């Protein structure tokens, strides 16, 4: 009986975290017929197709049972079938591959992260060697290398680091027709391009003289009739097919080639100038260019696009060009030139039009699976060459598949792709939304894509066909703007690689629940209504005329019966990060772009706090991002601790969920998971059981809710500066934890092995106080700049011994150890607490790189409180830097004594037009205070009241969280009405009136401010631009090799540039001596620097400065241009420019200064 009670009670407890039962009151008026799809499926589905795992097979079976025509070949099967059989040059032997299989991975994901391994599984293939002469067949299972696997979160672990492969947007293979104006005449020039997935391009062009030309593989242009003749057509056939087109007849007249042979030779001369032309060579060349499957591949998508554009009925597996394709393309372009609107084709009548290259029907996605498949293809092609060579060199009797195959090129191709490709990127793990967005990113850059410098305005611009496919808001600022986008929240990718978006079918004015996914070129054929078109109870349009997007992308009003489809959701057009911005519809697009991008830079705070004003997508974003732990099976929680949750499942099995505790992310932020459930809680599949970084009750929580006032304060918040209350520092409200990893290894050197030890020469005992007997720092030690983390000594070269030393050594047999201190110390500007130490030792069986005997990693954590100079932002692109942190008693306060947390400048709002922040402010106050419509003095049944009662938002407790979805959120009249319905405080007073403003008092004088001030709760993020990472000071450090001036930048421990303008300022003040010091002894007067150092050490006066090194460089440069430059003294004698003198080196040696001129090779050296 007791157990049953526990389970029932557990069921109630679990209800607080089950999906769909969030505590938000939503202001949405539109019901959505479709859930947001799994947000990582872009990555996972593509990889599942590549490896052909059980999940993918199940999906194929399901779609086949629904009557879809789906290929059952995985990406790996496709590519091994493509390469098979590999035949030798005489075609007597062949080798074929089939049935790729994966064995279990050697290490788990966590082990790979810890030990710097790649998370991969061994791939085996069945290989068959056939001797065609004897008919003998030898079969073997061959190991094809370790194949990197994708984790559940859509990432790869490569050498211990988490990486993401970004999907690439490329021009789809197919046929494209363009019309451009000729610069010299007023005629149009028409071009057609047949673009394959790989192989040579075929381009047709009609110039201003109305001649139809063709270019093969971007070479010289020739008449198109030459190509047709080379393909076996006669003049009569050409006249019969194209007789009605003047341009073709004109071209035929100008073409003097006689018959097929003549045409082939003509083409050969143009493609291979200087080589003797023969008919066979010409025929082979043309076949290899366009009709050989090994050299030319349209891919399925190219065949699909050509069939669609030219109205052909070729089979999908016909992946080279056919003569029909060429003729149809010529026919299309001459008809387009002729001004016709339709032509007849095998599929029926075709509408003729030029193409828009930036249309999403002409751009497709190369997702992870395809990118890896292409890379494998390269590797296998290299392997094929090796196999061919070995077939000819080895003895036929002794050949086995294993002896022919060399897997090196395949492994190298994969390694190269994951390690160095532009599309394989170091994962952005600042917070969960950063990771999620990174995995959903669409990039037009990369191999086979565009380059920043050559991409024009048109490619970058928002296109109508992006609607519901690529977010028009979220893209980087700077040189990549518009080239990198983000998949819209409902978008998905079809088997051809085109992005589809869902619509609700409308039949005769009635909106059904049937969902159709349309690609961009399908969508162009339909009339589509917006998601906010009003519907009655029977799902019919309320209005007679509905606002729609027409077939050609124009917006207009049509009768309800003419509508074909309707949007599924108002947030269909935006990405996940953009959909997290409340009141997006009231923000200017430029600021919304900044808001979407800055959410990705928010650091996880110690206390996560989900927003009072959300948009309703917070739960899905957090769970799908993969940082929230969810139950994989239904059952009851058996045991909970900080790092493990054990559950008993309904089928009698047990599950163990391990939580990440204070792990370092790629960006140095802290990944920490906390349990959400208690023992005895009931779990269903998908129930969140632990929060991750930046999540609160399984909702995305990037920042914290703060009481904000919009008012100027003594000019301290001029130009976006922010004033904060000391309370946020004291109560650790904007405090984050940052973890740095420091690594040191002990190697074998030419002079002997390095050693990790506590016994370091010339280091005091107090410096070693926190090291253990191995010479490694203890966990829990507080360290600051310069402290030793790991003691290490490196052998020094043997020096010549004096006779006395030799005598002593002969007597005592003691060899004085010659070692130098190469310990790892805490770098400049860093400090914190040691929270973890990992030691890897070759003797203990750990795998280490060659030459490394020991490897030590030390993790140092810092608790960073908010401070002046840190950057804060809202979700509307309203960012600023903290200028002042005031004591709580000095902050402006409300009538009941509540001090505000943040003071923002009101002038930052009007010109930036991000009004969403003001609405968020007021709605945040409402959510914090709670409301009840019965408290409103306005007794009329106003519209806004009825709307709120209808969506059950007539009452809310204080602290209730609300959701205002994008394009369908709380309206201004609702907020104004609710401000008059807030629950008063315990004294029965409302602090804020109907206008959303309050009377504030100056904390310093106690006087009221003259005007009422807008006050409310706003969600504030702490961004990763922290002042501690940027502040930097230098004493002495590395110098540039040539100019001898200090290097620049914090990473190089560089100096501050004193530039031309600063010099002018010093000149203007007449500060001659200060300026001379800056330009010489503080910069690049090498002997002077040393002398000054010596003078300071000895307490003498500073000597005069000499000639700066950069002046000597200038003289040398002028001399190298054959200009005789001499430096003269006052009396007119030439001064010899000598290098640093002997005494400089003497002084330097005495003072222990290293004067060797060299650039530091790494930051560690600095």
Curated annotation (Swiss-Prot):
Keywords: DNA-directed RNA polymerase, Nucleotidyltransferase, Transcription, Transferase. The keyword Disulfide bond does not apply. GO terms for biological process: DNA-templated transcription. One of its GO terms (molecular function) is ribonucleoside binding. It is an enzyme of class 2 (transferase). Its EC number is 2.7.7.6. Pfam families: RNA_pol_Rpb2_1, RNA_pol_Rpb2_2, RNA_pol_Rpb2_3, RNA_pol_Rpb2_45, RNA_pol_Rpb2_6, RNA_pol_Rpb2_7. CDD domains: RNA_pol_B_RPB2. GO terms for cellular component: DNA-directed RNA polymerase complex. The keyword Nucleus does not apply. Coiled coil: none annotated. It catalyses: RNA(n) + a ribonucleoside 5'-triphosphate = RNA(n+1) + diphosphate. Disulfide bonds: none annotated. Belongs to the RNA polymerase beta chain family. NCBIfam families: PRK00405.1 (NF001616), rpoB (TIGR02013). The RNAP catalytic core consists of 2 alpha, 1 beta, 1 beta' and 1 omega subunit. When a sigma factor is associated with the core the holoenzyme is formed, which can initiate transcription. DNA-dependent RNA polymerase catalyzes the transcription of DNA into RNA using the four ribonucleoside triphosphates as substrates. This is DNA-directed RNA polymerase subunit beta. The gene is rpoB.
């Amino acid at each position: 009986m007791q157990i049953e009670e526990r389970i029932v009670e557990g069921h109630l407890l679990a209800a607080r975290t089950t999906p769909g039962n969030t505590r938000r009151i939503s202001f949405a008026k539109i019901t959505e017929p479709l859930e947001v799809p799994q947000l990582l499926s872009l990555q996972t589905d593509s990889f599942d197709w590549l490896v052909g795992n059980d999940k993918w097979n199940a999906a194929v079976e399901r779609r086949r049972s629904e009557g879809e025509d789906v290929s059952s070949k995985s990406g790996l099967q496709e590519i091994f079938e493509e390469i098979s059989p590999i035949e030798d040059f005489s075609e007597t032997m062949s080798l074929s591959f089939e049935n790729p299989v994966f064995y279990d991975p050697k290490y788990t994901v966590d082990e790979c992260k810890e030990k710097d391994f790649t998370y991969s599984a061994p791939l085996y293939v069945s290989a068959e060697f056939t001797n065609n002469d004897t008919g003998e067949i030898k079969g073997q299972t061959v190991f094809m290398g370790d194949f990197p696997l994708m984790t559940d979160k859509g990432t790869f672990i490569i050498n211990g680091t988490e990486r993401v492969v970004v999907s690439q947007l490329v021009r789809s293979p197919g046929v494209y027709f363009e019309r451009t104006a000729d610069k010299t005449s007023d005629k149009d020039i028409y071009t057609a391009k047949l673009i394959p997935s790989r192989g040579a391009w075929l381009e047709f062009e009609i110039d201003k003289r109305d001649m139809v030309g063709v270019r093969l593989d971007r070479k010289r242009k020739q008449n198109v009739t030459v190509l047709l003749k080379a393909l076996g057509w006669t003049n009569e056939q050409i006249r019969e097919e194209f007789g009605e087109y003047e341009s073709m007849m004109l071209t035929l007249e100008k073409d003097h080639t006689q018959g097929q042979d003549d045409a082939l030779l003509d083409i050969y001369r143009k493609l291979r100038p200087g080589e003797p032309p023969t008919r066979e060579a010409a025929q082979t060349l043309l076949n290899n260019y366009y009709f050989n499957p090994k050299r030319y591949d349209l891919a399925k998508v190219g065949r699909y696009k050509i069939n669609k554009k030219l109205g052909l009925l070729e089979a999908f597996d016909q992946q080279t060009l056919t003569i029909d394709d060429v003729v149809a393309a010529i026919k299309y372009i001459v008809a387009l030139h002729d001004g016709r609107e339709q032509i007849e084709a095998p599929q029926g009548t075709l509408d003729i039009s030029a193409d828009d290259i930036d249309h999403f029907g002409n751009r497709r996605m190369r997702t992870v699976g395809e990118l890896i498949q292409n890379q494998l293809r390269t590797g296998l092609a290299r392997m094929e060459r090796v196999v061919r060579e070995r077939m000819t060199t080895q003895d036929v009797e002794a050949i086995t598949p294993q002896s022919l195959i060399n897997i090196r090129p395949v492994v190298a191709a994969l390694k190269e792709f994951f390690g160095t490709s532009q599309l394989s990127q170091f994962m952005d793990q600042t917070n969960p939304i950063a990771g999620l967005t990174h995995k959903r990113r669409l990039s037009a850059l990369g191999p086979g894509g565009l380059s920043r410098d050559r991409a024009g305005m048109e490619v970058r611009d928002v296109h109508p066909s992006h609607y519901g496919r690529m977010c028009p808001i979220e893209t980087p600022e700077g040189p990549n703007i518009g080239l990198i986008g983000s998949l819209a929240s409902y978008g998905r990718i079809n088997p051809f690689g085109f992005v589809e978006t869902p619509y609700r079918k409308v039949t005769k004015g009635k909106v059904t629940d049937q969902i159709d996914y349309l690609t961009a070129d399908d969508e162009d054929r339909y009339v589509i209504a917006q998601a906010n078109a009003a519907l009655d109870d029977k799902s019919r349009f309320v209005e007679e005329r509905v606002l729609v997007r027409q077939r050609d992308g124009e917006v207009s009003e049509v009768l309800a019966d003419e509508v074909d489809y309707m949007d599924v959701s108002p947030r269909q057009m935006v990405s996940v990060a953009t959909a997290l911005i409340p009141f997006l519809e009231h923000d200017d697009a430029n600021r919304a772009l900044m808001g979407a991008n800055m959410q990705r830079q928010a650091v996880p705070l110690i206390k996560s706090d989900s927003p009072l004003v959300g948009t309703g997508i917070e739960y899905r974003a957090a769970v799908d991002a993969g940082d929230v732990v969810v139950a994989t099976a239904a059952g009851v929680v058996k045991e909970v601790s900080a790092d493990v949750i054990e559950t008993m499942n309904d089928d009698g099995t047990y599950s163990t969920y391990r939580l990440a505790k204070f792990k370092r992310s790629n960006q140095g932020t802290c990944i920490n998971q906390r349990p959400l459930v208690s023992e005895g809680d009931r779990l269903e599949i998908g129930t969140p059981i632990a929060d991750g970084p930046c999540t609160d009750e399984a909702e995305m929580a990037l920042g914290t809710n703060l009481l904000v006032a919009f008012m100027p304060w003594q000019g301290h918040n001029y130009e976006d500066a922010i004033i904060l209350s000391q309370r946020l520092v004291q109560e650790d409200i904007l405090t984050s934890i940052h973890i740095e990893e420091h690594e040191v290894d002990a190697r074998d050197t030419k002079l002997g092995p390095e050693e990790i030890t506590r016994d370091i020469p010339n280091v005091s005992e107090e410096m070693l106080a926190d090291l253990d007997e191995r010479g490694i720092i203890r966990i829990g030690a507080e360290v600051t700049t310069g402290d030793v983390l790991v003691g290490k000594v490196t052998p020094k070269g043997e020096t010549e011994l004096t006779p006395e030393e030799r005598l002593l050594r002969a007597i005592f047999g003691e060899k004085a150890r010659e070692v130098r201190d190469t310990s790892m110390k805490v770098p400049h500007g860093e400090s914190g607490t040691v929270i973890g130490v990992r030691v890897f030792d070759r003797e203990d069986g750990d795998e280490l790189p060659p030459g490394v005997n020991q490897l030590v990693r030390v993790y140092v954590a810092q608790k960073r409180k908010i401070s002046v100079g840190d950057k804060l932002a809202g979700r509307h692109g309203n960012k600023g830097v903290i200028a002042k942190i005031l004591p709580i008693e000095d902050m402006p306060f409300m009538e009941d004594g509540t001090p505000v947390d943040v003071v923002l400048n009101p002038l930052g709002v009007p010109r930036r037009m991000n009004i969403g922040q003001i609405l968020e402010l007021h709605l945040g106050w409402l959510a914090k205070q709670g409301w009840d419509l019965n408290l409103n003095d306005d007794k009329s049944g106003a519209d806004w009241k009825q709307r709120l009662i209808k969506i059950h938002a007539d009452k809310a407790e204080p602290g209730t969280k609300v959701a205002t979805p994008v394009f369908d959120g709380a309206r201004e009249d609702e907020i104004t009405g609710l401000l008059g319905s807030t629950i008063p405080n315990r004294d029965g007073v409302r602090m804020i009136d109907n206008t959303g403003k309050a009377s504030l008092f100056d904390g310093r004088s106690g006087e009221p401010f003259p005007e009422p001030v807008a006050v409310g709760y706003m969600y504030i993020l702490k961004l990763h631009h922290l002042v501690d990472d940027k502040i930097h000071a230098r004493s002495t450090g590395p110098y540039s090799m040539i100019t001898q001036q200090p290097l620049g930048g914090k990473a190089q421990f560089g100096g501050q540039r004193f530039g031309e303008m600063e010099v002018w300022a010093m000149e203007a003040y007449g500060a001659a001596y200060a300026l001379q010091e800056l330009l010489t002894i503080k910069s690049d007067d090498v002997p002077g620097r040393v002398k000054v150092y010596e003078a300071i050490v000895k307490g003498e006066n500073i000597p005069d400065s000499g000639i700066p090194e950069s002046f000597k460089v200038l003289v040398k440069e002028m001399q190298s241009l054959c200009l005789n430059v001499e430096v003269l003294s006052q009396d007119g004698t030439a001064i010899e420019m000598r290098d640093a003198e002997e005494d400089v080196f003497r002084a330097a040696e005495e003072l222990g200064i290293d004067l060797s001129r060299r650039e530091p090779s790494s930051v560690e050296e600095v």
